[in-house]
């Protein structure tokens, strides 16, 4: 497991906290494995009625760890099975998910919220998915879920053009439920999760399932995306794009993206 994923039970709520602040919560393979286990364990436990995802101040997640990307792009290792092992349970969980975003939500740090039932964000939240900029394709079922949520054009701007969405734009697009101050974020997330947990659990799970696409449809799209993602990751185009990104990123004063 990973020391960068903190799991806590608060009553009937399971809190999954990304805790790698020195890397802006860039997600490693071990972190994916820890989150996958938490989701599966929580779903199997009748005492858990809701999941919560939180990051650290200033970063929900800056996306996948770029060192893992580089290793895969140069053929040193495979990349993808750990992500799939997390994304499929994320799509198939029967229990509601509430999330809180403060600061960066990049790549999978954005697409994870398409699987959440309520997402709270602070005014400084920034959602961005630079997949195509890195020679890659959308993941986490976002190519299916985003157009359904916000329409083709906004989804295209987010997923294909890599445009950043502020908290306000994300709320307008339907990614964010409510914008709250930084100091109130975790309390509001927990309040919502506890409200969910207080409802009759079977009725809640059925109601949630009725409002969502069948899990097998989402899982099928995630698998299709992953196939293209893996193929793209070892392409010359992606290798050059990732190396160019790392070159820019390592320059003094260079922004994250």
Task: State each model region's role.
Residues 40, 47, 54-92, 105, ...:
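Glycine- (often His-adjacent) and acidic-residue-rich active-site loop
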Residues 16, 20, 35, 53, ...:
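Terminal peptide-recognition signature
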Residues 1-56, 88:
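Conserved CoA-thioester-binding segment of acyl-CoA-metabolizing enzymes
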Residues 31-34, 82, 185, 225:
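Hydrophobic alpha-helical membrane-association signature
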Residues 1-11, 45, 60, 162-168, ...:
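C-terminal alpha-helix plus adjacent terminal tail
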Residues 26-29, 62, 71, 133, ...:
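Phosphate-coordinating loops and pocket residues in cytosolic domains that bind phosphorylated ligands
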Residues 6, 91-204, 235, 240-243:
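Crotonase-fold acyl-CoA enzyme core
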């Amino acid at each position: 497991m990973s020391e960068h994923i903190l799991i806590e039970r608060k009553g009937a709520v399971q809190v999954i906290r990304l805790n790698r602040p020195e890397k802006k919560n860039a997600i490693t393979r071990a972190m994916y494995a820890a989150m996958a286990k938490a989701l599966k364990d929580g779903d199997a436990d009748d005492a858990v009625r809701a999941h919560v995802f939180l990051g650290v101040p200033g970063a929900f997640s800056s996306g996948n760890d770029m060192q893992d990307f580089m290793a895969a792009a140069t053929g040193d290792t495979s990349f993808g099975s750990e992500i799939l092992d997390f994304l499929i349970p994320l799509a198939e969980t029967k229990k509601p998910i509430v999330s809180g975003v403060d600061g960066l939500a990049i790549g999978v740090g954005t697409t994870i919220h398409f699987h959440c039932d309520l997402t709270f964000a602070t005014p400084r939240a920034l959602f961005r998915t630079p997949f195509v900029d890195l020679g890659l394709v959308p993941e986490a079922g976002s190519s299916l879920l985003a157009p359904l949520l916000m329409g083709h054009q906004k989804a295209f701007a987010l997923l294909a053009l890599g445009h950043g969405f502020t908290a306000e734009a994300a709320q307008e697009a339907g990614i964010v439920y409510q914008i709250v101050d930084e100091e109130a974020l975790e309390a509001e997330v927990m309040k919502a999760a506890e409200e969910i947990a207080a409802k009759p659990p079977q009725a809640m799970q059925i109601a949630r399932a009725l409002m969502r696409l069948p899990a097998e449809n989402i899982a099928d799209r995630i698998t299709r995306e992953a196939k293209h993602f893996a193929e793209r990751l070892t392409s010359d185009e992606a290798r050059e794009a990732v190396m160019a990104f790392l070159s820019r990123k390592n320059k003094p004063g260079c922004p994250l993206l």
